[in-house]
From Swiss-Prot:
Domain BACK: 167-269
Disulphides: none
Role: Necessary to maintain the balance between intermediate filament stability and degradation, a process that is essential for skin integrity. Reduces kainate receptor-mediated currents in brain neurons, most probably by modulating channel properties. It is required for proper heart development.
Assembly and interaction partners: Forms homodimers. Component of the BCR(KLHL24) E3 ubiquitin ligase complex.
Subcellular location: Perikaryon; Cell projection, Axon; Cytoplasm; Cell junction, Desmosome
Taxonomic source organism: Danio rerio
SMART domains associated with the record: BACK, BTB, Kelch
Kelch repeat intervals: 313-362, 364-406, 407-453, 455-501, 503-543, 545-591
A GO CC term assigned to this protein in UniProt: desmosome
Name under which the protein is recorded: Kelch-like protein 24a
Domain of life: Eukaryota
């Protein structure tokens, strides 16, 4: 039993004898076992709010205030304790032996009086009125006084105010104050609304490096590349006297090859500033070549921005299934950015195998096939159909094709009786195949690619018992072949692609990737893949090299996709193919997608 002590209000007992002011008086009984039960009472936030409210009333009436903050000549009576409790800036000022800790009036420079007024309102009430007129000054004030909650509220308010007319200015403000999230949101907003943003005054005030960052982005949201060119020219003409020398650097980020040919001739080549800028002529020449050669000529400027609806995709044509012996009819495209595979029209020659495939402009050419086929088909990427075109003069399989200067070359192969040194060239305008100078050495299953205006035939099998390490180079101007530096290894069923004036070779049941520089006639080892493969598909897409499928040491086909980035040397695995495949065609084209297109 517990006795509760209390105080009797009437100091006279019933007998008239006064008692002690504090007496023992049993009010009620409770078991001791309940003493561990505790009631933790809390009034919630209402208590702290009411205390702050009283302190704010004290501030308004200058009651108990012990410091005056002076800003731009305007005085704000405050309580040191309240300021110190809210701000580490003031806590350091008042709690250490600084001069301000002893002074009645403390002057603060570098901020606005109105911003200080709003700041103090927040300190004493937890509320602040943020507007478009005061947000910048209030942000700077809260940053100075290290009030992160108010600072973050200002940043959030700025994010909600983003508009094509102010997003660039807000991004510059965010960068200046290390607001990474806000800066990122501003940049994303500007990329998504670039055509509108480019019409406003802030765009004309961009620094060259800031403008280049936007122009270089694949995520720039436009319906056509002409919008980018026009934005650049407006920026240059806005301060033409001192911006003229920057024109070439800016145009390097404009994808001139993707402009409509009529627009390019009339508007770009017709511009007086460009006509008087010889340093830009190489960029114009690149665009003209692309208009003629299509995807044969690849550079960062030939890669479509995704918002146009077009993207570079890898198309895999046919091939053999896991254990061989069954030819696949599928034509499928792979988008490395999204990781998606999409089925296209099945190719008509799927009953054959070991045919050759290459990309011509934005279409796909398929020729030959086992046994001794001379048929040639063209896949029209716009119509998604296969069309018969002129047949080869000589049927073959285990040959290779590539495109050089707008024409298709079918090289070497096997006709069922002998290995071929025969080379044919196809002109799509006349729909005709003609023979050119034969190879120095007949080979089948070589690696073939074009680079620096010449055709390279690398390795291959000169007979059924050996492999060649020779590199045969064809010059279309002289219609002649020369031998170049030999391949560092001798393996069958290798593959080659060219990128940035260099040739890359892989496959042949080796993990190695080799690079050949035609200008130096020199080979170098540049990397390793994850597994040994032969008869794999190789294609350049978005500035990287993709190795797809192939046959391993156990003879089984693979569905692996490996990406090699020559700029960094990094090799990664990406989305697997729909099925294992080898001896397949593999090319890169531009493909339109409604999901990506911005109307």
């Amino acid at each position: 039993m517990v006795l509760i002590l209390g105080r009797r209000l009437n100091h006279e007992n019933s007998g008239g004898v006064p008692e002690s002011p504090a007496i023992k008086r049993k009010v009620f009984e409770m078991e001791t076992k309940t003493l561990s039960d505790v009631f933790n009472f809390s009034s919630g936030s209402s208590h702290s709010e009411s205390v702050l409210q009283v302190f704010n009333e004290f501030r308004d009436s200058r009651l108990f205030t012990d410091v005056i903050i002076s800003v731009q000549g305007r005085e704000f009576p405050c309580h040191r304790a309240v300021l110190s409790a809210c701000s580490s800036y003031f806590r350091a000022m008042f709690c250490n032996d600084h001069r301000e800790s002893r002074e009645m009036v403390v002057e603060i420079n570098g901020i606005q009086a109105d911003a200080m007024d709003t700041f103090l309102q927040y300190v004493y009430t937890g509320r602040a009125c943020i507007t478009t007129l005061n947000v910048q000054f209030l942000f700077e004030t809260s940053s100075l006084f290290q009030i992160t909650t108010l600072r973050d509220a200002c940043a959030k308010f700025l994010e909600e105010q983003l508009d094509p007319c102010n997003c660039l200015g807000i991004q510059r403000f965010a960068d200046a104050h290390s607001l990474k999230q806000l800066a990122s949101r501003c940049r994303t907003f500007a990329l998504l609304n670039f055509p509108e943003v480019a019409q406003h005054e802030e765009f004309q005030d961009l620094r060259k490096d800031e403008l280049e960052e936007y122009l270089a982005s694949d995520e720039l949201s436009i319906c056509r590349e002409e919008v980018v060119f026009e934005a650049v020219m407006r920026w240059v003409y806005h301060g033409v006297e001192y911006r003229r020398p920057m024109l070439k650097d800016l145009l390097q980020h404009v994808r001139l090859p993707l402009l409509h040919p009529n627009y390019f001739v009339q508007t770009v080549e017709g511009d007086k500033l460009i006509q008087n800028a010889p340093e830009c002529y190489q960029l114009l020449h690149e665009a003209r070549r692309y208009h003629v050669l299509g995807n044969e000529m690849m550079s960062p400027r030939t890669r479509p921005r995704r918002s146009t609806g077009f993207s570079e995709v890898i198309v895999v044509v046919g091939g053999c299934e896991r254990m061989g012996g069954f030819n696949l009819p599928y034509t499928e495209c792979y988008d490395p950015v999204t990781g998606e595979w999409t089925s296209l029209a099945k190719h008509p020659e799927y009953t054959k195998s070991e045919y050759a495939v290459c990309a011509l402009r934005n279409d796909i050419i398929l020729s030959g096939g086992r046994i001794n086929s001379s048929y040639v088909w063209m896949y029209n990427s716009q119509l998604n159909v296969w069309i018969r075109v002129a047949s080869l003069n000589k049927g073959r399989w285990r040959h290779k094709m590539t495109v050089l200067l707008g024409k298709v070359y079918a090289v070497g192969g096997y006709d069922g009786q002998c290995y071929l040194n025969n080379v044919e060239v196809y002109d799509s305008f006349s729909n005709r195949w003609t023979e050119v100078a034969p190879l120095k050495e007949a080979v089948c299953s070589p690696a073939v690619t074009s680079c620096a205006g010449k055709l390279f035939v690398i390795g291959g099998e000169p007979d059924e018992n050996s492999c060649s390490n020779k590199v045969q180079c064809y010059d279309p101007e002289s219609d002649s072949w020369q031998l170049k530096a030999c391949l560092p290894f001798t393996k069958p069923n290798i593959s080659a692609v060219s990128l940035n004036h260099l040739i890359y070779v892989c496959g042949g049941l080796t993990k190695s990737i080799y690079c050949y520089d035609p200008s130096q006639d020199h080979w170098m080892h540049v990397g390793h893949t994850f597994s040994r493969q032969e008869s794999c598909g190789v294609s350049v897409c978005n500035g990287k090299i993709y190795i797809l499928g192939g046959r391993g040491e156990n003879g089984e086909a693979s569905n692996n996709v490996v990406c090699y980035d020559p700029s960094s040397g990094i090799i990664t695995s990406t989305a697997a193919m729909p099925r294992p495949v080898s001896y397949h065609g593999c090319v890169t084209v531009h493909r339109f997608s409604e999901k990506q297109h911005k109307p």
